[in-house]
């Protein structure tokens, strides 16, 4: 959740226009920006679905034309929910992606400087094409927003045209699927989902058909962003990543072509779009994925805890984490957290403590996969890890069986918090790191866990991601996923408009917490959908007319996110989008552009 470097000055003060700098994207207030007649023509072609939204928090500000105290009450309440931001054409789940430019707080400043100028409210592929064509022909910066649930801020930009796919919804189910242009059908269940189908809806509708899909833990994630970034979840240890499930996509290319891509046609794009990141190679209008027969799911909720600040705790954590590959071999997966000096009602930690808590899953594929076997595995794991420290640790393991993944998800996951300022950092941890140097493992996670905070140790890799067989023989998912067992995520947050605290938290995240994981697993990579942004600076400067934000540093993000696949991805990007109609940060091929005083220009 960090933003591009935005420097907001009055347009007349910028002195930058494409008439003088033809290598820059067009901006409002200059001769290069399309005329009102041109925007009106686009609106007519879209049957009136070209929006010019006010900043979403403007109803709370007396200086804004849309000021409405009654509406402000509703907006302020909705601001804290993910669905409210999803339903708004320009808002995002984290404030910092809009540079805190218009929060629903009357005492804070409000402007539209952090938001797109116009929005195409797309309902079909033709609408998307019209938006892409207009941006390309008029050299306007283009962004794509589905749900706004994007931890890299790719779904919003100032001085831009946005394509909003929110109303592109719909599902179609198949008992077998024949990709367009292919001679043979693919056996097994499949689902075609329109561009902005949310994963919560997809999970639920699959459940109603007695099917299960690979999905993550956040229901407001859109299917397009989830799959193009890789897509991890509790069942990826069984079936592979979300990108591994894709059978076909329909996309609009930067050149304005509406294409069906699969293993039989447009194969380079099919490879690139499954893991190469969103808003880069094209705009998804629909996607077809595999689905699997539902099966019972045994779920163990657990807590292992001790007093805060003990050396023994880190020894035990290193021992448990070293057993993750063995847990994967026994069919387990799930979500767990290392908690350091934490009080957490959600984790049942009622006083400051160090703990290890979460939920592990065991699908009932075999008669030996029972609730008792899952309970035994975890109780044995905790007993063995703490045997050297009698009386210093307490543990609980509670196992429950659910009819399928959806039943567990519905009972255990509510809406995520929203309307805050936050960034993430992450690392994929491979088996050699886990089973090798125990001291390095201990020191790495100790360095990566904030005091009073959490570090995730999600068991979402292993056999499923290693042995996945994506259609066409491969995809562009980070090769580090094929060796990884753990996806570790750390977050940092701060209050809006608190530049000093923001700089501090970003520096800690980059230079201390994520760096601890990088040193421990230097040859691995990161999951791009939940990762830090690259930058060469960690300064945060706020002047009266200028906002400059810099981001946590993911060194060499190209290879941290895509490994050896990056060079091929870059070649495909240059071929499919020679004009860089789609540009985002950090995305494939973005090296040729930079933000100059808030304007996107070629280097």
Placement of each model-derived feature along the sequence:
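Classical eukaryotic N-terminal signal peptides for Sec-dependent ER targeting/secretion
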Residues: 1-10
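N-terminal signal peptide c-region/cleavage motif recognized by signal peptidases
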Residues: 12-14
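Soluble FAD-dependent oxygen oxidases
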Residues: 2, 16-603
């Amino acid at each position: 959740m960090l933003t591009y470097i935005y420097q907001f000055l009055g347009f007349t003060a910028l002195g930058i226009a494409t008439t003088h700098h033809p290598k820059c994207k067009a901006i409002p207030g200059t001769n290069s920006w399309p005329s009102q007649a041109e925007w009106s023509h686009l609106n007519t072609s879209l049957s009136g679905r070209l929006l010019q939204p006010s900043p979403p928090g403007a109803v709370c500000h007396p200086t804004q034309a849309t000021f409405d105290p009654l509406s402000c009450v509703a907006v302020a309440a909705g601001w804290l929910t993910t669905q409210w931001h999803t339903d708004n054409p320009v808002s995002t789940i984290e404030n910092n992606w809009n540079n805190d430019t218009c929060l629903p707080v009357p005492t804070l400043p409000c402007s539209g400087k952090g938001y797109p100028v116009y929005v195409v409210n797309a309902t079909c592929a033709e609408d998307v094409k019209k938006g892409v064509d207009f941006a390309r022909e008029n050299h306007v910066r283009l962004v794509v927003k589905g749900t706004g649930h994007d931890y890299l801020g790719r779904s919003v930009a100032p001085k831009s045209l946005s394509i909003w796919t929110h109303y592109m919804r719909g599902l179609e189910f198949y008992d077998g699927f024949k990709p367009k242009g292919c001679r043979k059908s693919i056996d097994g269940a499949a689902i075609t989902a329109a561009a902005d189908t949310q994963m919560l809806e997809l999970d639920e509708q699959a459940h109603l058909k007695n099917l299960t899909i690979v999905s993550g833990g956040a229901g407001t994630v859109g299917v397009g962003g989830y799959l193009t970034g890789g897509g991890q979840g509790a069942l990826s240890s069984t079936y592979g990543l979300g990108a591994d499930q894709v059978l076909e996509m329909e996309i609009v290319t930067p050149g304005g072509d509406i294409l069906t891509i699969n293993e039989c046609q447009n194969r380079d794009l099919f490879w690139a779009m499954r893991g190469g990141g969103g808003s880069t190679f094209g705009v998804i209008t629909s996607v077809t994925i595999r689905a699997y027969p539902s099966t019972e799911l045994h779920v163990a909720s657990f807590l292992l805890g001790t007093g805060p600040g003990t050396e023994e705790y880190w020894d035990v954590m290193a021992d448990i984490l070293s057993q993750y590959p063995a847990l994967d071999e026994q069919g387990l997966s799930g979500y767990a957290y290392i908690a350091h000096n934490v009080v957490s009602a959600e984790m049942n930690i009622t006083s400051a403590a160090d703990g290890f808590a979460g939920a592990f899953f065991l699908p009932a594929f075999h008669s030996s996969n029972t609730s008792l076997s899952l309970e035994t595995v975890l109780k044995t794991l905790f007993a063995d890890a703490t045997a050297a420290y009698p009386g210093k640790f307490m543990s609980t393991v509670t196992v429950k069986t659910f009819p399928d993944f959806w039943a567990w998800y519905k009972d255990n996951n509510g809406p995520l918090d929203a309307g805050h300022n936050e960034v993430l950092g992450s690392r994929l941890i491979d088996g050699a790191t886990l089973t090798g140097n125990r001291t390095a493992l201990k020191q790495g996670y100790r360095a990566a866990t904030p005091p009073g905070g959490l570090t995730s140790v999600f068991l979402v890799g292993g056999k499923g991601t290693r042995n996945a067989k994506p259609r066409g023989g491969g995809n562009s998912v980070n090769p580090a996923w094929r060796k990884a067992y753990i996806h570790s995520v750390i977050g940092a947050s701060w209050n809006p408009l608190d530049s000093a605290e923001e700089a501090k938290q970003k520096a800690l995240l980059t230079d201390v917490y994520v760096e601890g994981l990088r040193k421990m697993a230097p040859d691995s990579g990161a999951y791009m959908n939940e990762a830090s942004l690259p930058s060469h600076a960690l300064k945060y400067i706020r002047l009266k007319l200028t906002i400059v934000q810099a981001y946590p540093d993911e060194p060499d993000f190209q290879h941290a996110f895509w490994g050896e696949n990056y060079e091929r991805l870059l070649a495909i990007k240059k071929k499919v989008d020679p004009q860089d109609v789609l540009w985002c940060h950090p995305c494939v091929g973005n090296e040729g552009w930079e933000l100059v005083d808030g304007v996107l220009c070629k280097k």
